[in-house]
Regions:
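Catalytic cores of nucleotide-sugar-dependent glycosyltransferases that transfer UDP/GDP/TDP-activated
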Residues: 1-436
Length: 436
């Protein structure tokens, strides 16, 4: 089976979150199972781009509204990732250093989707599946069905749409509908949701199959989906919750070259002690105290706003018998709070504002506990990384966290779970961790 994954991220090419991890791993394992898996993504100015060799495989031109753009498709030559990787280069739109956060992101990802459809439409054969990931590629199921230029040749190609996070839907005002390729006008309702063009809603309507990244998240979307609750309920017949996995070759404490000492389950105690000592030394913490870490975006979705008070209370309540370490970036005000806490709780708390892939590996290997108090967690990969490295996950009982972590109080439990995204629930769980 030939499967074409279309996404905005793919690790290690360009990654902003869990989407990149999944798109970087899933095609590799599909290929190992005998399928032909490919990834198509935008060409950003990243280290991976400059460090590898590429060949030009296609050039073309298209329009978004009245604006013509030229695009080219380049392919990584050596199959370095274990699957065919293609980058779409659109000069002035996609070739930027960051993935997201530009004022013209609508035009950027719209042009990317149009270019992908235009390219695949010119293939001498049809792929077996187009697998679209999140709202950045969510208009493709509509385009292949109803865009006048594509539908005759592409409408019968099966499409799968995976919801990695329904909070971000890619809304486009109807005042910009002219940017879209010409389509059957009587199908405008397949784009619309609450009087706006909603790419995610369109994909849920138009894709042959819809998947979410955990079983529990699919159920939760019928109750809380940022306005799409009724749609997910209506389309439940073609929707499936499939739990994400992790790349066990990248995340392997026995071979990981980003940690201080490698180990397996027989040497886990010795290995973690060495990594904890290394980590504590970097951040001025005590390697003999329990280390509770948080790795993630500093946003409300992750309950990061609760961290300063929960950590402060826990340090006072337990007389400094635990250390805390935070890795992440996001809300500037929250970043400032955490920075101030480093001085207030010197020797008990520290943080690294930003993202560091090497540091995240060392934190999984050197921490005793990983805290994930998320308000929303479609799947969550961090708790799986933690378990892989022998670190106990402390998670809210929601989404993929519910599907992957059982509480120590249950039979065969191996984590700490709590029900509420609240300071009280977090501090109580921290107390349970310290008492172990």
């Amino acid at each position: 089976m030939e499967i074409v994954h279309i996404a905005a991220e793919c690790y290690p090419v360009a990654k902003a979150g869990g989407l990149g991890d999944v798109v970087g791993a899933l095609p590799k394992y599909q290929t190992e199972l005998g399928h032909v898996a490919k990834v198509v993504m935008p060409m950003y100015r990243t280290k991976f781009l400059y460090d590898n060799e590429w060949e030009l495989v296609h050039e073309g031109g298209q329009h978004i509204g009245p604006q013509f753009f030229h695009y080219s498709i380049i392919k990584e030559k050596t199959n370095k990732l274990g699957f065919d990787l293609y980058l779409v280069d659109i000069n002035g739109l996609l070739d930027r250093e960051k993935i997201y956060g530009y004022d013209d992101d609508t035009e950027r990802f719209l042009s990317f989707q149009v270019a992908v459809c235009d390219w695949i439409n010119k293939w001498s054969h049809k792929p077996d599946v187009l697998h679209c990931h999140d709202h950045h590629t969510a208009l493709i199921p509509f385009f292949v069905k109803y865009a006048l230029e594509f539908k005759d040749n592409m409408a019968d190609i099966p499409t799968v749409f995976t919801v990695h996070n329904a909070q971000y839907q890619g809304w486009i005002g109807w005042d910009k509908y002219y940017l879209l390729p010409s389509f059957d006008s009587w199908k405008w309702g397949m784009l619309d949701w609450e009087k706006t063009i909603n790419p995610m809603a369109s994909a849920v309507k138009c894709a042959w199959k819809v998947t979410t990244v955990s079983h529990s998240y699919l159920d939760e979307l019928k109750e809380a989906a940022n306005g799409l609750e009724h749609l997910f309920g209506y389309e439940q017949g073609k929707s499936h919750g499939i739990l994400n996995g992790i790349d066990t070759q990248v995340w392997d404490p026995l071979t990981d070259n980003l940690i201080a000492k490698n180990y397996d389950k027989e040497l886990v105690e010795k290995g973690k002690r060495k990594n904890k000592k290394e980590l504590a030394g970097k951040f001025g913490l005590d390697p003999d105290k329990p280390l509770i870490s948080f790795i993630g975006r500093l946003v409300g979705e992750k309950s990061a706003d609760l961290l300063p008070e929960a950590i402060s209370q826990s340090i006072y309540q337990h007389n400094g018998h635990a250390n805390f370490l935070v890795l992440g970036s996001g809300d500037p005000q929250l970043e400032d709070q955490l920075d101030q806490m480093k001085h207030k709780f010197n020797g008990y708390f520290n943080s690294y504002i930003g993202y560091s892939e090497p540091l995240s590996h060392l934190m999984y290997a050197g921490s005793d506990f990983l805290l994930m108090p998320s308000r929303v967690e479609p799947c969550g990969l961090n708790q799986m990384y933690a378990l892989r490295y022998g670190t106990v996950p402390m998670v809210r009982n929601i989404g993929g966290l519910r599907d992957t972590v059982t509480d120590m109080g249950d039979t065969d439990g191996f984590g700490i779970r709590f029900d509420q995204a609240s300071i009280g629930a977090i501090t109580y769980s921290i107390g349970r961790a310290i008492d172990l």
